Amino acid sequence: GKAIAAKIKELVETGALKFFDDLRAEFPADILELFSLPGLGAKKIKALHEKLQVSSIAQLHEACVAGRVAELPGFGKTTQEKLCRAIDERQKYAGSFQYGQIAAEAERLQDDLRAHSEALHVCIAGSYRRRKEIVRDLDFIVATSAPAEISAMFVQHPLVESVIAQGPTKSSVRLRSGIQCDLRVVSAAEYPFALNYFTGSKEHNVEVRSRALKRGWTLNEYRLGEARPDSAAKQKKAAQKIPVIRDEVELYRALDLDYIPPELRENAGEFEAAANEKLPRLIEAENLRGTFHCHTTASDGRNSLEEMAAAALELGLQYLGIADHSRSSIQARGLDEARLRVQLAMIRKLNEGFENFRLFAGVECDILRDGSLDFPDAVLAELDYVVASVHSAFTLSEADMTRRIVRAMQNPHVTMLGHPTGRLLLRRDPYAVDIPAIIDAAAETGTWIEINAAPKRLDLDWRWWPLAKEKGVKCVINPDAHGIERLQELWFGVGVARKGWLTKADVMNCLPLGKIEAALGKKRSVNRDR
């Protein structure tokens, strides 16, 4: 209408909107934070603000501790206790960020630093480079002969919210997201050592330095040199000649190791593998040929079948699996049998118009409390695949939850297990479940296990994948996409797979269209005979 058109015109012409500024001025700046706490909606926040003058999480915590929240109508002691626990959980995670929360800022800043005419080499180090699921800060290493110019550009970058410190070789800022970001400026000769050291992990670095010392060398964040006489004397061999080191490949080679990818640098077997030429060739993002576990407007997605297919084609994928929620997920507008069959028919019809691309018809089927599935076998048999997931009763004991999930995996129509631990990073801990038992069940039943690539999940965690791989369990990387823009989050799942030592042979959706069709057909045929 005219009112909205006028507001759009004002935004375009002035870059601001008086209506929005006036609206924002009516409320305290921190009050919107209250919406991030579970159980608090607009009505309860309004009551807290009007009755108790609560306008921030800190003030709410004070009111809870004083017992005043429990006295409000519609709250009570139980709600007060839940809010206290939620605030305590939030404090526990203060200063931590999901990898996906800060990836856009990190990559943009890295790109802009690399574009600087005086930057010779630029790389993000730290836990971000190692693809840890939780990141506390960002470390940028830049090789340059003009440190002052690089530092000035860094602290003046548009993403910088505030400058913490600025010096000739190190500067620290806080970005708009709230994460602290450190810049270390080094020479080209120092760069490989600084990059390796600040990438970590601490445990990895200790072993790297130990291996250097055994050769009569000392290694730090700036150089490789001869060890002090007292240190070298402990090593029974004379110091070896120090090689020229121009990059990390040459650094590891000097230690008689294959290059160790950053994702594996946790001192969890990578040195033994690198010394014996047994490091895996890790999966790359370009190895993916398609994906499953995507939602549409039929349930709680934001885009139609046609739009999701078009987005997948634009990304160069050969196939896309549609897995809208099943009927028990009422909060997600889960499909009943009739609506599921309508969608199945739509997918079959759309596939008639594709060349070298296919939509697979599936469902994200709720695993009910007793381990049964949300649809009868006759319905599931009509689909191309089934994602089985837990969406309720998270507080079962470990034994009961494990039995529940294993029973679901034993259903012959289940293709893959979705987000196996139910965790929401920095928000909800995994439910109690025996993951080794789940992996054993997957190996026995041939069930694929998902890496849910949504940044808030990254589940199954990378720490479990070496065991799963050892047992012969196959992985499938899924974005759990509820919109076309979320398909690109597959990249986050690839990071988890790499950190879990997986190759493209371990990941089912690295198969091209013809082979994944055959694999799905074979799996259903084998399972029917179980």
Q: Model-predicted segments: where are they?
A:
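Short acidic-aromatic active-site loops that bind/stabilize oxyanions
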Residues: 99, 297-298
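Charged catalytic cores and adjacent phosphate/nucleic-acid-binding surfaces used
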Residues: 131-217, 221-296, 302-322, 327-357, ...
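Accessory alpha-helical DNA-binding modules that contact the DNA backbone or grooves
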Residues: 2-171, 178, 192-193, 206, ...
